[in-house]
């Protein structure tokens, strides 16, 4: 994969994280509210303004946002299964958002290698998380990846995404 695509995907993941983190404070109750939150995200608007690229061109980040939002219950069940002694409702918003994002990529996105999904989550945790957050996140995501690898957990097909 070209370095440019990696850098672009990293930026798309960061944007998806920021939108999803914002939604942890003000949840979207419908797909239309989700679209509005995505379009109106300050980071999305600033990025679109700076680059001249319309918000609609942020396809990968939208796929991640919609995928995590649409599958949050299943993702929380997966995270709970591998977060021994930690309930999802007791996790910090940053950590939970990063776990959901990476778990979505692990379970629903066959096009993303597990090591990439985990590494990207760890990079974002270094940027946005606190203290030992990366160790906590790494432990859970590594367990999810191993469960997928040995068949204890099944990979799901990503639902067809709707457009922004």
Swiss-Prot record:
Pfam family, one: NusB
InterPro entries listed in its UniProt record: NusB-like_sf (IPR035926), NusB_fam (IPR011605), NusB_RsmB_TIM44 (IPR006027)
SUPFAM superfamilies: NusB-like (SSF48013)
Keywords: RNA-binding, Transcription, Transcription antitermination, Transcription regulation
GO molecular function: RNA binding
Gene Ontology cellular component list: cytosol
GO biological process: DNA-templated transcription termination; transcription antitermination
Residue intervals passing through the bilayer: none
Similarity field: Belongs to the NusB family.
Functional description taken from the UniProt entry: Involved in transcription antitermination. Required for transcription of ribosomal RNA (rRNA) genes. Binds specifically to the boxA antiterminator sequence of the ribosomal RNA (rrn) operons.
HAMAP family noted in UniProt: NusB (MF_00073)
Full protein name: Transcription antitermination protein NusB
Gene: nusB
